[in-house]
A protein has these predicted regions:
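Membrane-interface transmembrane helices that cradle and orient dolichyl/undecaprenyl
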Residues: 261-280
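Hydrophobic alpha-helical transmembrane segments
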Residues: 10-17, 45-51, 190-206, 301-308
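Membrane-embedded alpha-helical segments of multi-pass membrane proteins
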Residues: 13-17, 70-74, 197, 201, ...
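Membrane-embedded, hydrophobic transmembrane alpha-helices
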Residues: 1-99, 322-326, 334-356
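Perimembrane helix-loop-helix junctions
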Residues: 302-330
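Active-site lumenal/periplasmic loops and adjacent helix-entry segments of GT-C-fold
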Residues: 115-231, 241-250, 259
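Membrane-interface alpha helices of multi-pass inner-membrane proteins
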Residues: 58, 280-296
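Transmembrane signal-anchor helices characteristic of membrane glycosylation enzymes that use polyprenol
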Residues: 103-130, 330-345
Length: 356
């Protein structure tokens, strides 16, 4: 019970980390700072930097504890940088957010209660899918063997080469690093902390979209979020994102389905207001870079989502510059897809041991 309570508290730890990483990018912008948007940007920046560190260590065949030490140092550096960057704008941003919350306390309380109920139902459920077990198994195997992606988490067999499907998707290895650092059991971290983090992030992106759609009308925003969460809880099928949010909550695909793809829709709404907003385009590009770390499915789905939502802006706003910008944001996923195809065709392979 004590461990479970601590795991719930670590959800706040994740959001603080995301905020500090995001502050490195968005800090110093005066009263323009948005707390939710900073967390959102920090999520992708965090995982993008992590996968750079992780792949560097993997290609040098170094153990997990080396990555843990290096990433701990990087987290400390980025946290300090985030605090320095946001020192002038964090207080005004908090005051602005607090004023809006206090003026709409009933709506936020209702959203909070429903979110807590949603989290409780999901965390107390028995998640038995094979894919979901992979994430805990890979995290536990990495910690137990002090290696990175060198053992099959289902069988325990040694792998002579890195599976390219998970080579860039280092989401579960980040779990292993944090579990090693904080001495948290992988099952507790994945099942409780990361599942709760995913649910809160999904509600946060709904709130961000609601603010863009309805402005400061908290009544409409509340109804919007309640309807979305109700749909997630009662419309669980293999064809909906709700399946990942309710039965495969601590998978990277859960964040892809319920944070990344809705996030691109949020970007689309922002660009409808101002198609030339450079910060919004940079955020979309950051998402395109960071999403493949969460799940390799991002390699195809993110470019497809961008093509469906963003490219039509060129017609709607009569701006041809939208097309090359959207293409640039699609490029990371396309490149990783080509690399995976080359791996499947035996054109490229990365071994788990020195070949020379």
């Amino acid at each position: 019970m004590i461990q479970a309570t601590g795991a719930v508290c670590l959800i706040a730890f994740n959001f603080i980390l995301y905020f500090l990483f995001g502050s490195v990018l968005t800090g110093g912008k005066g009263n323009r700072m948005s707390l939710t948007r900073t967390v959102f940007a920090g999520l992708f920046f965090y995982y993008l930097l992590f996968t750079i560190f992780c792949i560097t260590v993997m290609l040098r065949w170094r153990p997990l504890h080396v990555l843990t030490s290096a990433w701990t140092f990087m987290m400390a550096v980025m946290s300090i940088a985030g605090m320095v960057r946001s020192r002038r704008c964090i207080i005004p941003a908090i005051k602005k957010a607090s004023a809006f919350v206090s003026g709409n306390i009933a709506g936020f309380l209702l959203i909070g209660i429903i979110t807590i109920v949603f989290i409780s139902v999901i965390l107390m459920s028995y998640q038995f899918t094979l894919d979901a077990s992979y994430y805990v198994g890979n995290t536990a195997a990495a910690i137990r063997t002090d290696t990175i992606n060198m053992y099959d988490p289902f069988t325990g067999d040694w792998l002579d080469h890195y599976e390219m499907r998970y080579f860039f998707a280092t989401f579960s290895i980040n779990d292993a690093v944090i579990c090693s650092l904080l001495h948290v059991h992988p099952l507790i971290w994945c099942k409780i902390t990361m599942a709760g983090t995913a649910i809160v992030l999904s509600v946060m992106i709904l709130y961000m979209a609601g603010r863009k759609l309805f402005g400061t009308d908290m009544r409409k925003i509340t109804v919007f979020i309640i309807l979305a969460e109700t749909a997630d809880l009662f419309m669980i099928t293999i064809y909906s994102t709700a399946a990942f949010l309710t039965t495969r909550t601590y998978e990277g695909k859960c964040l892809l389905a319920n944070v990344v793809l809705p996030g691109i829709l949020y970007i689309y709404i922002c660009l409808l207001e101002d198609v030339k907003d450079r910060r919004t385009w940079l955020l979309l590009f950051l998402m395109a870079l960071g999403a493949p770390v969460l799940s390799s499915s991002s390699n195809m789905l993110v470019p497809a989502m961008i093509a469906v939502t963003i490219i039509p802006l060129a017609v709607l706003r009569k701006d041809l510059w939208v097309i090359p910008k959207a293409a640039a944001c699609m490029l990371p996923g396309i490149i990783l897809t080509v690399i995976y195809i080359a791996y499947v065709k035996n054109m490229i392979v990365f071994y788990t041991y020195p070949t020379r």
